[in-house]
Amino acid sequence: MTTLYGLSNCDSCRKARNWLDRFGVAHVFVDYREQLQSPATLVDWKEQVGGWDLMINKSSTTWRNLSPHRNAPGSDAEWKLLLREYPQLIRRPVVVTDDGVVSQGFSDNTFKARFGGYL
């Protein structure tokens, strides 16, 4: 079953959930502000999406309001601490399919490509 990670009040997450419902893709939703992800999970996501910088939303208000030393983590440990403290920095939604493949973000075209077998 596909797992969609994000925030309950996020428009992109709502759109992704609606898309999956509309096309009958079985999924569960996890609000990662309420259910923090383990450091190992964060590292797995980072490795699959291509790095910490690609995993976060640098245009978010939260990112812009961080102090300069916080928005320049120098190690995996610092990144993991930052994202567990501010999970809203993670680009949403994070989509993990049955086979463990991780992707981020929502668009109709990317979901059609990813879940085309359901259509």
Where are these regions (language model features)?
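Local sequence-structure signature of Cys/Sec-based thiol-disulfide redox active-site neighborhoods
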Residues: 1-23, 27-32
